[in-house]
UniProtKB/Swiss-Prot annotation:
It comes from Xenopus laevis. InterPro entries: MED16_bridge, Mediator_Med16, Mediator_Med16_N, WD40/YVTN_repeat-like_dom_sf, WD40_repeat_dom_sf, WD40_rpt. It comes from the Eukaryota. The lineage of its organism: Eukaryota, Metazoa, Chordata, Craniata, Vertebrata. It is found in: Nucleus. The keyword Repeat applies. Keywords: Activator, Nucleus, Repeat, Transcription, Transcription regulation, WD repeat. The keyword Signal does not apply. GO terms for biological process: positive regulation of DNA-templated transcription. This is Mediator of RNA polymerase II transcription subunit 16. Component of the Mediator complex, a coactivator involved in the regulated transcription of nearly all RNA polymerase II-dependent genes. Mediator functions as a bridge to convey information from gene-specific regulatory proteins to the basal RNA polymerase II transcription machinery. Mediator is recruited to promoters by direct interactions with regulatory proteins and serves as a scaffold for the assembly of a functional preinitiation complex with RNA polymerase II and the general transcription factors. Belongs to the Mediator complex subunit 16 family.
Amino acid sequence: MDVAYICEWDRRPRTSHCPSIPLVCAWSCRNLIAFTTDQRNEEEKDITNLIHILDTEHPWDVYSINSGHQEVITCLEWDQSGSRLLSADADGRIKCWGMTDHLANSWQNLVGSEVDGDPIVALSWLHNGVKLALHVEKSGVSSFGEKFSRVKFSPSLTLFGGKPMEGWIAVTVSGLVTVSLLKPNGQVLTATESLCRLRCRVALADIAFTGGGNIVVATCDGSSTSPVQFYKVCVSVVSEKCKIDTEILPSLFMRCTTDPARKDKFPAVTHLKFLARDMSEQVLLCASNQCSSIAECWSLRKEGLPLNNIFQQLSPAVSDKQPMILKWRILSATNELERVSAVALPKLPISLTNTDIKVASETKFYPGLGLALAFHDGNVQIVHRLSLQPMAVLYGSSLRPSEEPSLKRQRSPTPCIHFKALQMSWTSLALVGLDTQGKLSILRVSPSMGHSLDMSTSLRHLLFLLEYCMVTGYDWWDILLHVQPGMVHNLVEKLNEEYTRQNAALQQVLSTRILAMKASLCKLSQTTVTRVCDYHAKLFLISISCTLKSLLRPHVLNTPDKSPGDRLTEICNKFTDTDIDKVMINLKTEEFVLDMPTLQSLQQLIQWLGDFVLYLLVSLPNQGSSVRPGHSFLRDGASLGTLREMMVMIRIWGLLKPSCLPVYTATSDTQDSMSLLFRLLTRLWLCCPPHNQRLIT
């Protein structure tokens, strides 16, 4: 584990240099980081609570939102798509922020809810029923469906037809649970209910979900002598109103409080976290005093309830069916640690079967198996999520500026700089921390936790995680932190091999993702950087092709035949004539009729296609030079076939509106440039054998 980079903001006056409020941060699946700060005016009377959005790939470009929260922001939560963000404050107000036009630097407040005057201590989006499991045991198989299996999991609430209903759930300090549901028409249904009849103060809380569609809420009043309470929450819609039902579940006392030797040593519970949002059976607890902490991991299990002999004698049949009860059992506990300041849990849904854990241990594949603890002395430690045994450590001294004199640090009466907020990336290969000075640090977490591995094993680990991001659509920037320049070529080749082993339908779905993934990988090495522009050009070509084909409409509605775009592809592949007009007469030209203003608005895209075809044909004599942009296109039959289809489509549109055609400078006024380019392009396309016609090279 080491430092990737540190972001330092503009210096503030000493009185407001250190943030006066607890910092909150959240990491989305798009590798966008949201975090909060408070901003004082010159008189230091009014405080503005800001939300900052930062792209980890461009940390120098931070977008700040004036949240409008009058009180301190206590919670931030991204949705599963990474395009919406929830913020909640100490006044009970919850706001939902959404991207404007899919831009990471443009956000607006969409909807919201409030529990007036009741601070929010826990917040979560409702579960959408989508859950994957990564099987390390099957990392060597070819099928993505076996590597990343779909786990049966019910949404928290469903609409007609089983579609998951969107919304969020929050827990307040006074023991209330509030649920807001987003209806398809934009209406918000909100309901509030007490977790139990006897309401009590809630200092810490967390939310998790069960496979049956229920919600589990864990609460604690902050005292280690008090029990940690658990509640089952069921949400439903009755007569267009949101209804909440709660039920008390078994509670637990931390083991450190039941040990006579340590009964009063750790008076406060400082952290309460479920190990995963969709794993309500395991919880992490941390108790602390002024100087030290202790962490415990608990698991909820079904156990048989022993019956008294009297009941067994009265009814022998009863003894055959032993009643089962739910009971919390401690899995592991740490020794006395430095005082914990922040906890980060893994988001990677790795399978925790005995076989998968054994294979992960043998191959030194640890993403998803470790959780991070930040301490008040500035250190950060990764511990195993089940055994709580140390796996890696980063000392706080490596985070301090090297130019700062050590004597100055020793004499400083101020507390040591440490992280107040900590979050893991979605592949568990990076950490983000916000310290007491407001600095943001990105830390690299090695997949092997520092163990030395041979090159093939390291490539297999990174390939497995890249495949996971390809299947889920998550951003893979944090994986690139661990890719060395010498790995790029082999990684790209192996990624392409695994992609081509999938069925045709899945390849079509993943075609653009693997292009984007290869482009980002090739940027990391000087030997492959020239291929980056080819991948971006292919992405742009696919986008233009999909856009233009989507404008076509069948002449007769409700026809069971193929769509016009599919027929265009079929005809162009079937007729290999070099004469564009002979290919065009086999199409139903009435399907290509568009409005004149629409055709004219496409002229810029049409011009790009024409220029690109011209560039490829001009560079054909230099095809032996692999460093020239466009080199891979000359051997890519599928991309050349797509260009042929676009040329035929443009030819038809040119008959309707000649001004939309691409403009060329010809040597003769009578020369048909479109026909000439199509003839040369077709000859080049025919040189690509059918078994080499693929979209990705």
